[in-house]
């Protein structure tokens, strides 16, 4: 499989065409951004870590029957994935109060929820990716009610798998963001990535943060935090 011309470049990844109409080539970048791109920095090794961690987690999900776009890891920073039409919704699942939810509800960060909360955010940089209700989604016409139901069910299924998997590594899955795509056959599958860029991950005992909040809040060395997650997941750390 050959990497051809650049199709799209986002904050964290570049997407390239391949000679297969059904596949695209993903390259993870070393860039870190926060607050809708207001805070930016290049962090050497971040792309490798996100690629390695996403590979491990997508393979885990595939093992239990959850369909994803992941095909194979190509290099330390690259992977081959199925081409899908991305649904312009970020699906956020929350198990513990943190971040914007703490501010929105006036609840203390770290409060464990009795059951998960699933939220939808409309993917639009100009609007700042606003939180939307299912009624808003219907007005925006970006997903049908049936698709929204599938997204919610898949997010909750993935949540339970990841909660158990991270717990085995002594990590608490606080919350995480997912993106989904539609195949040419009309099937909804998991896309994008699952990494410390898209999850809040805390040590189960100390609540030490191993995610992008380290960068957002200037809490320490981001690569050290991501390396710790990779090590606990059983990947090959470069420390």
Swiss-Prot record:
From the UniProt record, list the reaction(s) this protein catalyses: 5-amino-1-(5-phospho-D-ribosyl)imidazole-4-carboxylate + L-aspartate + ATP = (2S)-2-[5-amino-1-(5-phospho-beta-D-ribosyl)imidazole-4-carboxamido]succinate + ADP + phosphate + 2 H(+)
Which GO MF terms are attached to this record?
A: ATP binding; phosphoribosylaminoimidazolesuccinocarboxamide synthase activity
Question: What EC designation does it have?
Answer: 6.3.2.6
Does this entry carry the keyword Ligase? Answer: yes
Pathway info: Purine metabolism; IMP biosynthesis via de novo pathway; 5-amino-1-(5-phospho-D-ribosyl)imidazole-4-carboxamide from 5-amino-1-(5-phospho-D-ribosyl)imidazole-4-carboxylate: step 1/2
Domain of life where this protein originates: Bacteria
Q: Which Gene3D superfamilies match?
A: ATP-grasp fold, B domain, Phosphorylase Kinase, domain 1
Question: Which PROSITE patterns does the UniProt entry name for this protein?
Answer: SAICAR_SYNTHETASE_1, SAICAR_SYNTHETASE_2
Please provide the record's keywords in A-Z order: ATP-binding, Ligase, Nucleotide-binding, Purine biosynthesis
Q: Name one GO biological process term.
A: 'de novo' IMP biosynthetic process
What InterPro entries does the record tag this protein with? SAICAR_synt/ADE2_N (IPR028923), SAICAR_synt_PurC (IPR033934), SAICAR_synth (IPR001636), SAICAR_synthetase (IPR050089), SAICAR_synthetase_CS (IPR018236)
Return the broad EC class. ligase
Family classification: Belongs to the SAICAR synthetase family.
Q: What is this protein called?
A: Phosphoribosylaminoimidazole-succinocarboxamide synthase
